[in-house]
Amino acid sequence: MTNNNAPRFLVIDGYTRAAREELQSGGASVAADLYVGMLERCGSAGTECDVIFPADPGASLPAGAAIRDYDGVAWTGCSSCVFSGEPDVAVQIEFVRECFRQGVPAFGSCWAAQIAIVAAGGEVALNPNGREMGIARGITLTDEGRAHPLYE
């Protein structure tokens, strides 16, 4: 945790380097940049954000940093699929498990939800209608989900 009143976040961008380059070549922003911008705009003065790209070979936390040093983790969406069998997927699932073990609050959407579910021992199923991007339909909350503070 930070020693001052300003929060320190770890932004984890799950896109592969090739996927990030493809986004940029098409004029889109890299997901991590969007998350950092939002956290800095909405956070208190002095909010700090570190970014890692765990799909990149050799990716690691900044020198001297540990997951427990962060006030929160924000995990971006990405174009990967939990079913791909790619080595970077397994690395990211294990990173989520470590975040869970450390007890650091985390937020994520889309891709982050898939790997968090798998990391926690749950199952993710292929959508029989194909991939959905940006909009998901027919999702219902369990009793546990409805009890989460987010929905109070």
Predicted regions located by residue number:
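Catalytic nucleophile loop
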Residues: 100-123
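Short, conserved acidic/polar surface loops in the N-terminal third of protein domains
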Residues: 84-87, 118-120, 128
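Pocket-forming structural segment of enzyme catalytic cores
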Residues: 14, 121-152
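Short secondary-structure boundary/hinge segments and terminal tails
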Residues: 60, 117, 134-135
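N-terminal beta1-alpha1 cap of cysteine-dependent amidohydrolase-like domains
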Residues: 1-94, 98-102
